[in-house]
Amino acid sequence: MTRFGLALLMILVIQGLVTFSEAQLKMGFYDQTCPYAEKIVQDVVNQHINNAPSLAAGLIRMHFHDCFVRGCDGSILINATSSNQQVEKLAPPNLTVRGFDFIDKVKSALESKCPGIVSCADIITLATRDSIVAIGGPTWNVPTGRRDGRISNFAEAMNNIPPPFGNFTTLITLFGNQGLDVKDLVLLSGAHTIGVSHCSSFSNRLFNFTGVGDQDPSLDSEYADNLKSRRCLSIADNTTKVEMDPGSRNTFDLSYYRLVLKRRGLFESDAALTMNPAALAQVKRFAGGSEQEFFAEFSNSMEKMGRIGVKTGSDGEIRRTCAFVN
């Protein structure tokens, strides 16, 4: 290769490295273009969280569901239109997701200060972190620079979001597809320490587990009887809500893992964590461990999840309104 050719190659390599670097997530991505972006998100969260602590559970679920379909690109926020009536938001796993109006409020606050700068995907990620911190949970790094996706697909949501009735094989396959492992599965399931669930997400365990009117033997019988007599009175009940971690639904702590070991997790997916030796070992470790250790490891898994399939650089767009592509 001539000296000129070598020099040209080096220039192209350097340009490529710069482009690659610019296209990555980084801490403080908006420092120059919207210096108060993260403060604005945090302020809106703090203004609402005292009156609505359940917002934290809604946002972390939204973030989880968004990242598992086409990556963390805000596609869960897109409304149906005449040209696309089959969006993620309308898929059964997302019909009970909450927080859409709140994300719109944050977006409006940001647009008033820095129009067209901060992505809806970053808003979900930042607001989730800030809401968990606001209820006393862990914090974690949120590198920013995500861009918003233009595609939202009903079928992809059905195929990729881990279901509450999933067995261990189903769960670890879906997590593995996203680059997550057994430890991430157990840690992220720990978010069930906050929030509520509709009876319809687990009533088959109470009334018709194998199709013959039976009860799931992996669910503590006393707990199941209590649910049937006091909360979910029939398999047709799709409106009643039940705390996933009774008595502390707004407290981010280790009690979820202790409930799982007592066979009192609401979902089949909770019970599934005890069906695999590696997962069970992690559940036992957290159930008997320190909150500080759990918080640190949960934070690592949340940051890892927040990097799934992100769109950066010139990929995607910055939506003007989170519910519609530009």
Swiss-Prot record:
Ligand binding (substrate): P162
Source organism's superkingdom? Eukaryota
Site positions for Transition state stabilizer: R61
Question: What is its subcellular localisation?
Answer: Secreted
Residues at the active site: H65 (proton acceptor)
- State the protein's name: Peroxidase 39
Which residues take part in binding heme b? H192
Question: What's its job?
Answer: Removal of H(2)O(2), oxidation of toxic reductants, biosynthesis and degradation of lignin, suberization, auxin catabolism, response to environmental stresses such as wounding, pathogen attack and oxidative stress. These functions might be dependent on each isozyme/isoform in each plant tissue.
Choose one Gene Ontology CC annotation of this protein and give it.
Answer: extracellular region
The UniProt record lists the keyword Kinase: no
- Disulfide bridge partners, by residue number: C34-C114, C67-C72, C120-C322, C199-C232
The enzyme's main class, written as a single word, is oxidoreductase
Position of the signal peptide: 1-23
What the record notes about the co-factor is: Binds 1 heme b (iron(II)-protoporphyrin IX) group per subunit. Binds 2 calcium ions per subunit.
What does UniProt list as this organism's lineage?
Answer: Eukaryota, Viridiplantae, Streptophyta, Embryophyta, Tracheophyta
